[in-house]
UniProtKB/Swiss-Prot annotation:
GO terms for molecular function: small ribosomal subunit rRNA binding; structural constituent of ribosome. It comes from the Bacteria. Keywords: Ribonucleoprotein, Ribosomal protein, RNA-binding, rRNA-binding. Binds directly to 16S ribosomal RNA. It comes from Helicobacter acinonychis (strain Sheeba). This is Small ribosomal subunit protein bS20.
Amino acid sequence: MANHKSAEKRIRQTIKRTERNRFYKTKIKNIIKAVREAVAVNDVEKAQERLKIANKELHKFVSKGILKKNTASRKVSRLNASVKKIALA
């Protein structure tokens, strides 16, 4: 247990940040999972709709500073490639 006031504050801050990070990481995973599930069942319309939402959300996280620009672009690019693959098939 912390012996100093500043150490106690740091513990509180760490807990708060951990919860916030967990929330965003879960949200990102769920967004990506939704697109991948639509791709898995070859539902082109649903996949494109979810890709549009994923693109919007991931870039919103970039503007908030949660994700780096290249990370979001890479994720969107890979999702886009998988959706395009089933659309052409």
